[in-house]
Amino acid sequence: MNNAIFPNKFKAALAAQQVQIGCWSALASPITTEVLGLAGFDWLVLDGEHAPNDVTTLIPQLMALKGSASAPVVRVPTNEPVIIKRMLDIGFYNFLIPFVETQEEAARAVASTRYPPEGIRGVSVSHRANMFGTVPDYFAQSNKNITIIVQIESQLGVDNVDAIAATEGVDGIFVGPSDLAAALSHLGNASHPDVQQTIQHIFARAKAHGKPCGILAPVEADARRYLEWGATFVAVGSDLGAFRASTQKLADTFKK
């Protein structure tokens, strides 16, 4: 089949601690998402938390990535089983779960993506993810091929990082630098030494549990530093940021 869904190559790459360079997709456009997919990134976050995305906007973007080597990762707006189920049914296999603070919340995210008895995912026999009922052994294969990445972006999450990283079914730990900075009383200043030290601590604890860690780092120097610290999957920019910067540069070239 074209763009075969199993095995999940992104999940395997994370398990093997292979560096994965990604990009954020926030414009909710299948055209810009397709352009990102052609650029050669290993993975793309289709953001459902801070971008204007929902089921109706995400399906065309998944279609736009069909045949691309870039793995689509959906950031859901919240750690809620029904929302996660809907993302599963439209064809996502890689999940970024925001604001996870405890082992119980991490386990809830994992359970939301697994069919019983391993989890609590609701059963539909025909949907986009199983190619409308044509994927053999979809139920068992799906349970084994879902990627769960949890975001740590609060002090409580930092305090519980060991328990979260040790949660069965969690494939990776992702740092939300902006929210983490705010939680540490450095709103708008993720480069503050306290924030950077905490990021390094999270990376170290994830590594101690054999879990890859990731982060969003649109500044090249930051991205390279995080890679040196052991980050495995790093989003190095966004479609919105690239578009804004390039159009501003173009306008400035002729208007100033």
UniProtKB/Swiss-Prot annotation:
This is 5-keto-4-deoxy-D-glucarate aldolase. The gene is garL. Mg(2+) binds at E153, D179. GO terms for biological process: D-glucarate catabolic process; galactarate catabolic process. Its EC number is 4.1.2.20. Pathway: Carbohydrate acid metabolism; galactarate degradation; D-glycerate from galactarate: step 2/3. Its cofactor is Mg(2+). Catalyzes the reversible retro-aldol cleavage of both 5-keto-4-deoxy-D-glucarate and 2-keto-3-deoxy-D-glucarate to pyruvate and tartronic semialdehyde. GO terms for molecular function: 2-dehydro-3-deoxyglucarate aldolase activity; magnesium ion binding. It comes from Salmonella gallinarum (strain 287/91 / NCTC 13346).
